[in-house]
């Protein structure tokens, strides 16, 4: 009794780990027999108490937390708001994912924290509450899912499933929640997909790898080991003790100069405490990694046996023990994943809350604006930020730590307990994160658009990946795409606007901008027409823009009877100010038949020459600078006398003399040769020398007086009649005779060849323009005139190898003066440019302007006054080209009346087109409650209020102009005083004083802006065009400004109306006083680091990959936790994502280490160092998985397994070819020994083999054949002549021999020792005899 009274009584709960420690200490003190007796008494006591208590578990014991209902409702509300922000384009997919995880994780964690107080208050002796904290079966997390909620789950790939499980097992799961739960919870049939039998199969594979590892020697003699640092703060004391206890030291340990522990001494708990207290240097311990043989292991490298606490005995099968030690807890890992597997976890951040109500103030210079990981605007502070909250009488100071987010603005009023800052989590969580990719898919079909914040050039050649340097929006503009395989692309033109119900099937329909009888025309005071610059009979237009001139190549088909021959360019020229006067040249054409490559002189008979400077019948010519002056010639032919001209500097060395005769390719200077032969004439002009070469024949006349006194004459060809024929034939061509006088007063005649040009009727340029253009304006004239660009007798000199144009055909615009157009003195012309993926088309628009107000009425309908309303019968045909519509296209477009836009593929071929129809647009308005200051709004034309804009009203033939009928229906007049009518004789100055015209702009699908202004018809920059709802002079208050082409997100309030904010997101394409037309679009937010797939303007379909985000996420307790993750590591499957910048990091590290060591660092990393680091990394990964599940395994068991899967190397092609074949797998120690024996360098590569491959690459083919692929293994072994030395357990077991472990090892050991004794005896006798 006295001894029992001295014992200490511990009144505390003992868990499973504490019981293990007690049993270990009992074995040390009392031995195995007495310890087993004590444990029997503990078992009896436990069963007796459990029987007495008689706790039962029923479904009524599962008590649901009362606050769960409103917590889940609040989480759903936050998720709904988050979904709206994502739809509006405020947050991207990754930010939505992160915030969704945190919302549901915080809700689930709050329910788990509320679970214990709820049980304690309502039912402290609840069986569920007692069992969950006893440690016998279950834990708080499992009970939490019984009475709380699971939250978000993961799919088999580890990706989050958006639908959270809100129900618990007490309430019952829905069918969807049950299926989602099955992925991680391993229930039912779903469990077969993840193989519950992995635990047993893993044990078998582990034993196969290490079954031959037996302790065969006491010491292998190695001097190597691994180091363990006792000062490592990242390693807890418990893990340090588990790592060191039972090991053997590989080196002596010193404290100063004193040796406290010698080598080859095993480490007990006493030595470990001394190491921790003295903080010694790193300790080198022996390990199975450093043992000198792979087929067995020594006692000192293994250490103490965990059974009895002493060094392991010889003959012990430590390999099988290691395999079972790792495989057996796999059943526990599988069971532990039953409830908690697959639950997506996250970390809740720490928040700083306001202590009271007041206004917050801080130093803005110490904080920088940024985005939080949830996409919210915030300020990031890099240093301690002092925040002051001023209330009525009290000032509160709050210190925000560095790298935290401030969630409020300066001078903002905050309420008490409001979150003002978020403290970023520590860096210790970085080890638990991994980089993953998330693909964002397009939700709709349409056209991709992005801003200048995105690199338009692909990152790599022949790639469609673009890098995002700044945060930007991607927009998918709505539109319907159709393949055009069945339609001839030469018939279907880009930017055609089709209305299929008005076009017959498979019928050719040739239509221009203004056709048919029931047209809409302008009043006589204003003429407007617009037409293509080429005829419908020509092919598609590709134009080049040079300054203010457009060069348009086209194909001749019938004009010169040349089939599809590419002819030179027609240039349509518009002045910079856009003003064209009468008799102005509108277009010109350079005929190639009047083009020459050589210099010369033009000669012609001047029947009528009109200079462009004449006042009467003025022909205004704006040509190229070289052609001055220009002449209009009324002749039918002219002559061209060729000659070669060279302009040389004074310093040039001329190698020919004046008046000399040279041949072809005669050197003129050091670097020039003549192209023709003839007479050389040298003339000095100012600082230049002009050298001419006249080709022809030279004649020396006998009598000078008989020669004509003309200095130069043209002689026509002689006509010679043939004998016995009435026909005559030209004997010679035209000749030019020139009188030459030399310096010595010698005379001779030079007869030069002449080229005759007949000016015939050239191309009728009028035919290239639609005839309806002239019908619309009766007195409009277009006439063709020929211009000779050089004067009579003027020298024509070419520049280098450029050709010289002699005649130019011009198209002159003119109109007759009559009563209707007496005051029209000028016309306004402009080009409309349409660019579609590199395909550029230009259209010409001309306005004959008299006054600045115009009215619209039907032709021949004087009863109609003012403006007409829109109806189907008044609609003109607006297709500027002919098209053939086949039946399938008509069916596909029967519900889609819209404008066509061609889409080009990579080969610049039209393969599909997109149609912008009414269903792709949204009308916002009307804005009827907008107030005016002393102003009255007049609607000139009433439109039917519909949320869908009729595309035929808003978009014209190119998408850049509405129909003529409704051209001015978009104008609204605001006046100081109400005016009942507008008189026709209203003068311009009065109009300016009376009216304020609100301009209307329109934009097509190609983002070109059209402004129907009578004065300036240029294409405007969409980013500089702003428009107000009302003229600023009449606004009572400021309204938001809308930019044409601007992208507007959904739920954005543009103007204060009864209709509320904008209901749709898209791009502004129509702006009117009463409404704004928006092309529907879906926004996608992308942040820096994301990659965009596709090109600008490319057509995307629903489901296509749009953006790829790369982000870090916490490793969740997904389906690969526990046993499957251990299997992944042991089979050497990749479970970590490799950093995409790994190569750049290695290059940077290589540069730095080269400067330090003088050699690249890669030469320092050999195969041996790589194997050592890989072994340590694999051991740590496996231990991390088991420790996370509460399972403790000694490192030596894992080291034996890892040692086997890392002991093979791959022979390189350039090494040991005389011993091993390239690509052969051999042991590492075997390769090293062979290299030492051959005395040559060893070339091999490290290799990590999984446990399955290692089992099939052993020294025993019997062991391999009994594991897998029996026939293949035996056949290869027979062909190779392999020998099995029967060193392992399995092969001896198969053949019925003695297993070389335990007593069997002793028998083998006795045989080998007897042989060794005999050998020693013989050697001893030999030595004794040698001494005699």
Curated annotation (Swiss-Prot):
Q: Which family, according to UniProt?
A: Belongs to the RNA polymerase beta' chain family. RpoC2 subfamily.
Where in the cell?
Answer: Plastid, Chloroplast
Which domain of life does the protein's organism represent? Eukaryota
Primary enzyme class: transferase
Q: Which cofactor does it need?
A: Zn(2+)
Q: Mind naming one GO cellular-component term on file for this protein? A: chloroplast
**Catalytic reactions of this protein:** RNA(n) + a ribonucleoside 5'-triphosphate = RNA(n+1) + diphosphate
How is the cofactor bound, as the UniProt entry phrases it? Binds 1 Zn(2+) ion per subunit.
Question: Its biological function?
Answer: DNA-dependent RNA polymerase catalyzes the transcription of DNA into RNA using the four ribonucleoside triphosphates as substrates.
Per the UniProt record, which EC number(s) apply here? 2.7.7.6
Question: Could you tell me what this protein is called?
Answer: DNA-directed RNA polymerase subunit beta''
What is the species of this protein?
Answer: Lotus japonicus
- GO MF annotations, alphabetized: DNA binding; DNA-directed RNA polymerase activity; zinc ion binding
Annotated InterPro entries: DNA-dir_RpoC2_beta_pp, RNA_pol_beta''_euk, RNA_pol_Rpb1_3_sf, RNA_pol_Rpb1_4, RNA_pol_Rpb1_5, Rpb1_funnel_sf
Q: Which GO terms describe its biological process?
A: DNA-templated transcription
Which SUPFAM superfamilies does this UniProt record tie to the protein? beta and beta-prime subunits of DNA dependent RNA-polymerase
Location, primary (coarse class): plastid
- Keywords, in A-Z order: Chloroplast, DNA-directed RNA polymerase, Metal-binding, Nucleotidyltransferase, Plastid, Transcription, Transferase, Zinc
Q: What Pfam families does the annotation carry?
A: RNA_pol_Rpb1_4, RNA_pol_Rpb1_5
Positions the record marks as coiled coil are none
Instruction: Indicate the quaternary assembly.
Output: In plastids the minimal PEP RNA polymerase catalytic core is composed of four subunits: alpha, beta, beta', and beta''. When a (nuclear-encoded) sigma factor is associated with the core the holoenzyme is formed, which can initiate transcription.
List residues binding Zn(2+): 220, 291, 298, 301
Keyword Chloroplast set for record: yes
């Amino acid at each position: 009794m006295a001894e029992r009274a001295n014992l200490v009584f511990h009144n505390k709960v003992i868990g499973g780990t504490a019981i293990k420690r007690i049993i270990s200490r009992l074995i040390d003190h009392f031995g195995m027999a007495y310890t087993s007796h004590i444990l029997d008494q503990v078992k009896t006591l436990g069963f007796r108490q459990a029987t007495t208590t008689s706790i039962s578990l029923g479904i009524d014991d599962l008590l649901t937390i009362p606050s769960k209902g409103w917590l889940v409702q609040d989480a759903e509300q936050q998720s709904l708001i988050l979904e709206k922000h994502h739809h509006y384009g405020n947050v991207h997919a990754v930010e939505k994912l992160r915030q969704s995880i945190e919302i549901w994780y915080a809700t689930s964690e709050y329910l788990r924290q509320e679970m214990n107080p709820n049980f304690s208050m309502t039912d402290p002796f609840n069986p569920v509450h007692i069992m969950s904290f006893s440690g016998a079966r279950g834990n708080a997390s499992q009970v939490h899912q019984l009475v709380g909620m699971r939250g978000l789950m993961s799919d088999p790939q580890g990706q989050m499933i958006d639908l959270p499980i809100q129900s618990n097992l007490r309430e019952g799961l829905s069918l969807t929640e049950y299926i989602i739960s099955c992925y991680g919870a391993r229930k039912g049939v779903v469990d077969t997909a993840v193989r519950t039998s992995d635990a047993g199969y893993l044990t078998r594979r582990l034993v196969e790898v290490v079954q031959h590892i037996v302790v065969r020697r006491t010491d292998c003699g190695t001097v190597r080991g691994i180091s363990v640092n006792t000062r490592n703060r990242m390693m807890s004391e418990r893990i340090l003790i588990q790592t060191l206890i039972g090991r053997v030291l590989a080196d002596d340990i010193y404290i100063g100069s004193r040796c406290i522990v010698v080598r080859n001494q095993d480490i007990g708990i006493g030595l470990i405490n001394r190491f921790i207290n003295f903080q010694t240097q790193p300790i080198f311990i022996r390990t199975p990694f450093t043992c000198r043989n792979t087929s067995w292991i020594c006692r000192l490298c293994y250490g103490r046996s965990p059974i009895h606490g002493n060094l392991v005995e010889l003959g012990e099968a430590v390999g099988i023990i290691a395999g079972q030690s790792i495989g057996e807890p796999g059943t526990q890992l599988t069971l532990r994943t039953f409830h908690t597997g697959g639950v997506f976890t996250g970390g809740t951040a720490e928040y700083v809350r306001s202590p009271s109500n007041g206004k917050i103030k801080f130093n803005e210079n110490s904080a920088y604006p940024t985005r939080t990981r949830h996409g919210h605007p915030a300020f990031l502070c890099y240093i301690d930020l002092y925040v002051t909250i001023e209330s009525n009488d009290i000032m509160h100071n709050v210190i925000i730590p560095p790298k935290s987010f401030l969630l409020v603005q300066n001078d903002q009023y905050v309420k008490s307990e409001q979150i003002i800052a978020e403290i970023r989590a520590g860096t210790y969580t970085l080890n638990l994160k991994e980089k993953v990719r998330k693909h964002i898919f397009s939700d709709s079909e349409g056209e991709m658009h992005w801003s200048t914040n995105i690199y338009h050039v692909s990152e790599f050649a022949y790639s469609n990946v673009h890098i995002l340097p700044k945060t930007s929006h991607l927009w998918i503009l709505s539109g319907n795409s159709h393949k055009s395989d069945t339609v001839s692309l030469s018939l279907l033109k880009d930017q055609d606007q089709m209305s299929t119900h008005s076009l017959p099937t498979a019928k050719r329909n040739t239509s221009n901008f203004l056709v048919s009888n029931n047209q809409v025309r302008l009043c006589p005071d204003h003429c407007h027409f617009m037409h293509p610059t080429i005829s419908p009979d020509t092919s598609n237009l590709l134009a080049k823009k040079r300054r203010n001139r457009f060069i348009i190549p086209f194909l001749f088909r019938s004009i010169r009877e040349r089939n599809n021959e590419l002819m030179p360019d027609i240039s349509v020229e518009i002045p910079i100010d856009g003003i064209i006067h009468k008799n102005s040249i509108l277009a010109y054409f350079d005929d190639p038949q009047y083009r020459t490559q050589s210099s010369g002189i033009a000669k012609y008979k001047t029947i009528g020459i009109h200079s462009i400077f004449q006042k009467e019948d003025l022909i205004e010519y704006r040509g190229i600078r070289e052609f001055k002056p220009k002449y209009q010639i009324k002749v039918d032919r002219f002559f061209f006398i060729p000659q070669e001209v060279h302009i040389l500097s004074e310093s040039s060395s001329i190698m020919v003399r004046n008046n000399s005769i040279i041949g072809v390719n005669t050197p003129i200077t050091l670097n020039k040769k003549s192209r023709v032969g003839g007479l050389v004439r040298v003339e000095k002009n100012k600082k230049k020398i002009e050298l001419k070469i006249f080709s022809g024949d030279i004649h020396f006349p006998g009598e000078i007086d008989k020669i004509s006194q003309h200095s130069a004459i043209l002689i026509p060809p002689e006509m010679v009649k043939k004998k016995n024929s009435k026909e005559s034939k030209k004997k010679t061509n035209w000749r030019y005779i020139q009188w030459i006088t030399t310096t010595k007063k010698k005379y001779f005649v030079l007869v030069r060849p002449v080229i005759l040009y007949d000016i015939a009727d050239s191309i009728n340029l009028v035919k290239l323009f639609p005839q309806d253009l002239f019908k619309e304006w009766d007195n409009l004239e277009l006439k063709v005139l020929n211009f000779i660009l050089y004067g009579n007798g003027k020298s024509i000199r070419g520049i280098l190898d450029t050709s010289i144009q002699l005649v130019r055909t011009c198209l002159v615009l003119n109109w007759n003066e009559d009563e209707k157009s007496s005051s029209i003195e000028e016309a306004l012309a402009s080009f409309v440019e349409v660019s579609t993926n590199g395909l550029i088309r230009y259209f010409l628009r001309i306005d004959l302007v008299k006054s600045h107000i115009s009215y619209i009425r039907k032709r021949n309908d004087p009863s109609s006054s003012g403006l007409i309303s829109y109806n189907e019968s008044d609609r003109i045909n607006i297709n500027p080209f002919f098209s053939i519509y086949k039946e399938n296209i008509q069916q596909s477009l029967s519900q889609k009346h819209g404008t066509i836009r061609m889409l080009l593929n990579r080969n610049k071929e039209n393969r599909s087109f997109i149609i912008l129809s009414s269903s792709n647009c949204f009308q916002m308005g009307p804005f009827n409650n907008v107030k005016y200051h002393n102003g009255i709004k007049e609607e000139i034309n009433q439109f039917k209020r519909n949320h869908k804009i009729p595309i035929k009203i808003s978009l014209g033939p190119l998408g850049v102009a509405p129909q003529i009928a409704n051209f001015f229906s978009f104008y609204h007049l605001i006046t100081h005083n109400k005016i009942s009518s507008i008189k026709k004789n209203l003068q311009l100055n009065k109009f300016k004083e009376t009216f304020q015209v609100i301009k209307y702009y329109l934009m097509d699908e190609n983002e070109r802006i059209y402004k129907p202004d009578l004065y300036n018809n240029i294409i405007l920059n969409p980013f500089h065009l702003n428009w107000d709802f009302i003229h600023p002079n009449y606004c009572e208050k400021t309204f938001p400004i809308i930019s044409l082409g601007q992208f507007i997100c959904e739920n954005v309030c543009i103007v204060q109306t009864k209709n509320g904010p904008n209901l749709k997101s898209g791009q502004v394409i129509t702006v009117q006083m009463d409404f704004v037309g928006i092309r529907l679009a879906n926004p996608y937010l992308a942040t820096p680091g994301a990659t965009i797939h596709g090109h600008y303007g490319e057509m995307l379909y629903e489901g296509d990959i749009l953006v790829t985000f790369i982000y870090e996420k916490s490793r969740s307790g997904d389906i690969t936790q526990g046993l499957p993750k251990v299997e992944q590591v042991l089979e050497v499957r990749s479970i970590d994502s490799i950093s995409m910048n790994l190569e750049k990091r290695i290059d940077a590290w290589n540069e730095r280490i080269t400067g330090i060591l003088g050699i690249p660092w890669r030469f320092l990393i050999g195969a041996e160092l790589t194997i050592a680091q890989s072994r340590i990394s694999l051991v740590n990964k496996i231990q991390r998985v088991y420790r996370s599940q509460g399972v403790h395994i000694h490192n030596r068991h894992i080291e034996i397994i890892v040692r086997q899967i890392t002991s093979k190397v791959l022979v390189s092609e350039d090494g040991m070819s005389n011993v091993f074949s390239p690509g052969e797998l051999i042991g590492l120690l075997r390769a090293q020994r062979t290299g030492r024996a051959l005395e040559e360098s060893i070339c091999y590569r490290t290799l990590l083999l999984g446990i399955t491959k290692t089992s099939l690459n052993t020294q025993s083919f019997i062991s391999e054949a009994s594991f897998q692929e029996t026939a293949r293994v035996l056949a290869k072994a027979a062909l190779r002549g392999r020998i099995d030395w029967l060193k392992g357990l399995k092969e001896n077991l198969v053949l019925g021999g003695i297993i070389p472990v335990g007593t069997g090892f002793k028998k083998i050991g006795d045989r080998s020792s007897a042989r060794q004794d005999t050998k020693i005896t013989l050697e001893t006798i030999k030595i004794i005899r040698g001494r005699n």
